[in-house]
């Protein structure tokens, strides 16, 4: 094989040119293969193809000549796509990232924290938790903007730390994203219960899974457009609820009640005793605040959702730095704005809220907004809000389907999952990874034998632990990445995003999340509240992740998996490919290897 290119004529799809230096495997029927200046040898052997400009990485398995020749007849060769496409614009990135964070927790589950801690504790706890999230976000932004590939922080764990941490982090993050799919499916079911419950919980499950699958197998640009509009709708919902709060607190309601900040004055800080024993105890206020802080650690997320889009973003080193900055500001505004508003519209001592929490009532009836609307005799608006909440939950589940499938795809690329999961369809969608991620939706069937609210609580505990572990991993990976970059910075391109206060910023995030992992299930240790099931849902992921790390490092690798030498870490292959893409997209600010 003496030349670099050949042309393949697809049946019904025109001609595509493949660059030998970039492309790896697809399965399709080829109408004809036409040599370009001797790319194919006379024997007719088929060589390796490495990328399709509009379709992602492909591979053609090499077949030696066995007396056959290539002619114009249609023949089938085993080829399959193994790379996603860069089709997402800045607006897609920002809205998809916001969509992955904002679900029903911000509008419904927040009522439990309000009831336990009071409005002031709720607002202060969320504001406080935004500090470590900011530290983690800027640390993530620095390494992801420098290395914008599929599953970047997981791939950097392999490259900069060791394989054992990468394996543990990959499986934990995939589990985190997958388990949130049934969480949102159950949330939709609980919201529907606001109107009626005389139906099988399997119906909304089936409908959502089919819709998630149909959306996920489309080209990523169509997924981006759909999620852009769904996320826009969620932002409109949040802003609409802010407007509702402002108007009604000034008397714009059927009761003409100018309630203002009455609920803040009534019980700004509320005592909470998990075991019900409040005799002679003054720790109730602290435990109320702690309950709000634990809720914040579940609800607030940040840069990891942007990072999962990095491998499919156009001009990533131009788009991602802006996205990280803008998304954090917008999410902080939405989180803190929601905490302020629920404390204004609903009292933590409201009888309906108290009954909803104590009786574990399913549905949006436990949403402080819906309770406030009913108290003010606003009849139609609760139904509208509930419809909007269903859309919000569906959109969040859609985003988790995307993130989980791309995570598993990245794991397969690194060899931590079977290679079959690297296969993509012609649109660059990792279809097998989508399928295995959606299998987790079946977990939502647990609600057939238990109260939906109970199942939601189980999932919340699992998600909280996994999310905190993921934050710890992000900080560890960043510290190792920073060490490698500073050792090699004279031979590497500039950082597109430079965070401040490092390494102390990352250390703050690391310590905060490590402490919260230990705290988040503390109530299970009260003598009256010990429950093996609750303990497992709170701390099982900690033991599983430790087991994966230790097992892989000392059993699978027999202790030979050592920390990477920062002087030997090679970023050049991935960065060269990113440079080539950005040059084709007329963005040349961070050129380095091409100039060299």
Swiss-Prot record:
Keywords for this protein: Amino-acid transport, Membrane, Transmembrane, Transmembrane helix, Transport
Chain ranges on the Cytoplasmic side, renumbered to this chain: 1-94, 139-165, 221-227, 310-326, 401-427, 481-505, 556-596
Transmembrane annotation, as ranges: 95-115, 118-138, 166-186, 200-220, 228-248, 289-309, 327-347, 380-400, 428-448, 460-480, 506-526, 535-555
Signal peptide segment: none
Topology Extracellular: residue spans: 116-117, 187-199, 249-288, 348-379, 449-459, 527-534
Alphabetical list of InterPro entries matching this protein: AA-permease/SLC12A_dom, Amino_acid_permease_CS, APC_YAT
Membrane topology: Multi-pass membrane protein
Single biological process term from Gene Ontology: positive regulation of polyamine transmembrane transport
Localization, UniProt: Membrane
GO terms of molecular function: amino acid transmembrane transporter activity
Family per record: Belongs to the amino acid-polyamine-organocation (APC) superfamily. YAT (TC 2.A.3.10) family.
Function: General amino acid permease with broad substrate specificity. Can also transport carnitine.
Protein's UniProt name: General amino acid permease AGP2
Organism (species): Saccharomyces cerevisiae (strain ATCC 204508 / S288c)
Classification lineage: Eukaryota, Fungi, Dikarya, Ascomycota, Saccharomycotina
Gene: AGP2
């Amino acid at each position: 094989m003496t030349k670099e290119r050949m042309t393949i004529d697809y049946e019904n799809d025109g001609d595509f040119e493949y660059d030998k230096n970039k492309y790896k495997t697809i399965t399709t029927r080829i109408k004809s293969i036409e040599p370009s200046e001797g790319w194919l040898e006379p024997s007719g052997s088929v060589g390796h193809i490495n990328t399709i400009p509009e379709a992602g990485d492909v591979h053609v398995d090499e077949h030696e000549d066995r007396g056959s020749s290539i002619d114009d007849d249609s023949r089938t060769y085993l080829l399959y796509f193994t790379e996603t496409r860069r089709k997402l614009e800045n607006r897609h990135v920002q809205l998809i990232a916001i969509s992955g964070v904002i679900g029903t927790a911000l509008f419904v589950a927040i009522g439990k924290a309000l009831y336990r801690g009071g409005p002031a504790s709720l607002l202060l706890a969320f504001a406080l938790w935004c500090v470590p999230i900011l530290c983690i976000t800027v640390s993530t932004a620095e390494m992801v903007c420098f290395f914008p590939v599929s599953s970047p922080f997981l791939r950097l764990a392999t490259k900069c730390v060791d394989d054992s941490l990468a394996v543990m982090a990959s499986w934990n993050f995939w589990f985190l994203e997958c388990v949130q799919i049934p969480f949102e499916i159950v949330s939709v079911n609980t919201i529907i219960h606001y109107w009626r419950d005389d139906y099988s919980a399997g119906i909304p499950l089936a409908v959502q899974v089919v819709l998630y699958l149909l959306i996920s197998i489309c080209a990523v640009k169509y997924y981006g457009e759909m999620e852009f509009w769904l996320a826009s709708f969620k932002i409109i919902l949040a802003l609409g609820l802010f407007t509702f709060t402002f108007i009604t607190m000034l008397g714009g309601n059927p009761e003409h009640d100018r309630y203002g900040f009455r609920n803040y004055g009534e019980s700004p800080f509320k005592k909470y005793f998990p075991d019900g024993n409040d005799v002679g105890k003054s720790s109730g206020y602290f435990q109320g605040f702690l309950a709000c802080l634990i809720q914040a650690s579940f609800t607030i997320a940040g840069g990891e959702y942007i990072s999962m889009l990095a491998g499919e973003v156009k001009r990533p080193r131009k788009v991602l730095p802006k996205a990280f900055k803008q998304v954090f500001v917008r999410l902080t505004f939405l989180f803190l704005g929601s905490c302020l508003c629920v404390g204004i519209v609903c009292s933590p001592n409201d009888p309906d809220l108290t009954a909803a929490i104590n009786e574990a009532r399913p549905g949006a009836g436990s949403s402080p907004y819906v309770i406030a609307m009913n108290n003010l005799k606003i009849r139609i608006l609760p139904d509208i809000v509930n419809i909007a909440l269903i859309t919000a939950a569906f959109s969040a589940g859609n985003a988790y389907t995307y993130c989980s499938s791309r995570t598993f795809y990245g794991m397969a690329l690194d060899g931590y999952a079977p290679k079959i999961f690297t296969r993509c369809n012609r649109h660059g969608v990792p279809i097998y990874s989508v399928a295995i991620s959606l299998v987790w939706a079946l977990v939502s069937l647990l609600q057939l034998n238990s109260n939906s609210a109970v199942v939601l609580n189980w999932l919340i505990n699992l998600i909280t632990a996994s999310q905190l572990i993921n934050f710890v991993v992000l900080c560890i990976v960043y510290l190792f990445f920073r060490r490698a970059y500073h050792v090699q910075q004279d031979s590497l391109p500039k950082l597109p995003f430079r965070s401040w206060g490092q390494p102390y910023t990352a250390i703050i995030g690391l310590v905060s999340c490590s402490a919260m992992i230990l705290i988040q299930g503390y109530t299970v240790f009260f003598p009256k509240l010990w429950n093996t099931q609750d303990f497992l849902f709170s701390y099982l992921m900690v033991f599983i992740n430790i087991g994966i790390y230790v097992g892989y490092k000392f059993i699978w690798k027999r202790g030979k998996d050592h920390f990477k030498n920062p002087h030997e870490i090679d970023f050049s292959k991935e960065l060269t490919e990113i440079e080539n893409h950005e040059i084709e997209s007329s963005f040349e600010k961070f050129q380095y290897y091409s100039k060299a």
